[in-house]
From Swiss-Prot:
Co-factor requirement: Zn(2+)
SUPFAM superfamilies found in the cross-reference section: Class II aaRS and biotin synthetases, Putative anticodon-binding domain of alanyl-tRNA synthetase (AlaRS), ThrRS/AlaRS common domain, Translation proteins
Entry domain remark: Consists of three domains; the N-terminal catalytic domain, the editing domain and the C-terminal C-Ala domain. The editing domain removes incorrectly charged amino acids, while the C-Ala domain, along with tRNA(Ala), serves as a bridge to cooperatively bring together the editing and aminoacylation centers thus stimulating deacylation of misacylated tRNAs.
The protein's name in its UniProt record: Alanine--tRNA ligase
Gene Ontology, cellular component aspect: cytoplasm
Reaction catalysis annotation: tRNA(Ala) + L-alanine + ATP = L-alanyl-tRNA(Ala) + AMP + diphosphate
Domain of life: Archaea
SMART domains: tRNA_SAD
Gene name as annotated: alaS
CDD domains per UniProt: AlaRS_core
Annotated organism of origin: Saccharolobus islandicus (strain M.14.25 / Kamchatka #1) (Sulfolobus islandicus)
Documented EC number(s): 6.1.1.7
First-listed, main subcellular location of the protein, grouped into a coarse class: cytoplasm
Amino acid sequence: MKASEEEYRLNFFIKNDFKRKICKSCKTPFWTRDEKKEYCSDIPCTDYYFFDINIKSQPLTVKEAREKFLSFFEKRGHTRISPKPVLARWRDDLYLTIASIVDFQPHVTSGLVPPPANPLVVSQPSIRLEDIDNVGITFGRHLTTFEMAAHHAFNYPDHYVYWKDETTAYATEFFTKELGIPEEELNFKESWWEGGGNAGPCLEVTVGGLELATLVFMQYKITDNGNYTPLKLKIVDTGYGVERIAWITQKTPSAFHAIYGNLVYKFFNKIGVAYIDETLLKVASRFAGKIDPDNPDTIKIHRQMVSKELGIDIKAVEEELDRAAKVFQILDHTKTIMLMLADGLVPSNSGEGYLGRLVIRRALKVLRLLKSDVRLYELVKEQIDFWKEDFPQVLKNKDYILDAVELEQQRFEKILEKVPSIASTLARKSEITTEDLIQVYDSNGIPPDLLEEELKKKSVKFELPRNFYALVAKRHQTSTIKSVYDKVKLPKDMLEYITALQPTEKLYYKDQYMRSFEGKVLGVYKNYLILDKTTFYPEGGGQLGDTGLIIDEKSSKRYEVIDTQKVNDVIVHILKEEPSTIKVGDNVRGEINWERRYRLMRHHTVTHVILAAAKKVLGEHVWQAGAEKTPEKGRLDITHHKTLTEEEVKLIENYANSVISDRRPVKPLEMNRMEAEMKYGVSIYEGGVPNSATIRLLEIKDWDIESCGGTHVSNTSEIGAVKIINVERIQDGVIRLEYVAGPALVDYIRETEAKIVEASKIIGSSPDQLTSRLRRLLNEIEEKNNLIIQYRRIIETELLNNLKPYEINGNKIYIIEGLGDEEENKEILRKLTSTDNTIAISISDNRLQIATSKNMRVDKIVEELLKGGGKGGGKGTFANVILNSKKSKEEIIEIVRKSL
């Protein structure tokens, strides 16, 4: 949508003598107080000339720039709020926090819940991977991690806060009064913003070639057919670049120097590469606005401009700038890695973990291209020491961060062993496409840059896309949201039937111990029954739906409820048979299977207990990746970067049982969504993100609080005790814990006792002597195995010394009948065929093992053998064959003769 000029013709501009100009280069309208200005002061229309602007502000570090911004707006009636994590775990459609507005999407921006303050100010650390391939090349214009300082105002129909004029006035005052940028250097470039289904006009604030801020006025909703409809809630969505504010005040050769200070020089030193000539860097940075990373020709032109300006050979310029760009990439990526892991990301092959691993592996690839032997965790450690005051969580989670990074490097080094074989496979293709490279990366984790080296050896050329990592990240940066209808186990016609029915009153929230109730029938469809109220809990949050009975009060007929499901707020009772005596309007009585429900309640509550215990033992990076509660056992999947040790499992179990024996109260709470987030953080969403203004929390006193809609015991003592019965790694970065509690634990103990008694009987021992008896048996078996090995060696030696070969056309053929197991045979055959022109065959009934010396081909013999029927095959000098019928030694020799 192209906004009209009137959208930007603000009273503020008119009153303060701003003139609307058209940029001579890009033809975009912009507002300025400099009547002589011809360009919009944005790149590529101009170079970075902010180096020459007299700015009154003292040089600001990132920390000082952040505080100056926050304090400025705090003094002007804005409430300072804490930033959210860089992992957008309050969203089910997005993995990373890419901007400050994400903090309030979708529930505040949709009007479902009020903002935490209005107006407010925040400095939100953000991560965007769409520019990952451009980092370093543009001297700091592109970063994967940055702080978006923002002030937001939410204008409701009945509550106006402020809009365009005030927002523009704030920007002008901040940049000219607080930073001391000359008023004539400040420009407001007209633009248009769209994102997250919303849109609106925006103004880009440019100074000396740098875009310092974007002022978005979110006022339209984009409909499914692409039309724009006005929003009732109009939002001021601003974004000021904290790092760019630091850069423009410091005027350092690159933004990296402004962001990282002395860490820049330390990284060059630790990585083991020479620091770049600073004069060259300053000139290159000034001309950097000419670089469009999507157009490689502009990079070449930029290098030529630097070469000409300094009178330096262009190859020397390219070498210096390429080396510096790689170090800048490592600086940027290690900070991103640090923030991701500090907020709980566990590297893996899916979800947010995939994106974390992508950044780690790109950093490792760059280190490899620089031929550096520094360990990546050493560089991340430097980042932690540098940023620990700004981001306390990085110091708190330091051990996990460094451990996870080192483990990822070890895995990456192991993966690189596959490069030659992967390159050989690719080399056989007539053309290597970008899709091929992405598939190789997704399947094997091998960066195309490293494949390129190997493919060059094979004289294979391919085009490496400059934005490869951005392409890969784009495929994985969002999560597919399942429709509510995709999550339920009901047929489509049933889903259509219930759309007109009113919400069901949830009696299980009023009293989780209610076993029976009376309700009115609102709907009957096949074997599905809908009531006005129910105490049957529908499947959700990993807890199975209740079972029980529905009793027709007229006929007293009892119908078995085999499952309970929910669609939106309508609860559906699934009966074993169609309720022939029940019709709409009837009154019925419901009785849940209480013993089953109580087991589910115990297993659900203990899941919360174990999750908090796992965090305590393993670290705050642990996050619930899935859960299931059945009457028989509970299951919890957690994110963790390595297999659990026995000691860690014991500690988790001990903490859980300690909480159970402490008799801690378990209390459900209902809170305003935003209030809950502000008070407890986004960890309340471990079990999922509810779509409601008010959310239900479960609090285990002084232990855990989490959003949960399940049914629970009211005190941890009701759980009885818990035992973790199984721990396994189910996928990369995810560990599964299975456990039993209460009566299920008693069942488990009885079953285990029965197995011990049975095992004792089998080996002729009593249960209390089972261990010692087993140990003796194993020692005896080991002794006998050693004896068997000795006898086999004697037989093998005797066989090799006395076995006479058949001679066929100068070839030796050894035939062995009915000897040992396959591995033993293979070793004997290998020894027999150690000299040229030798074939050895082991026969066991209709099974053959065939070996040949290196100068012969086993496949020809196999081919001849299979002519008579059978199956088998081999590779190189060894094969296995199963014939349809047993053949004599003489018949096999004849077949071999034919193959020769």
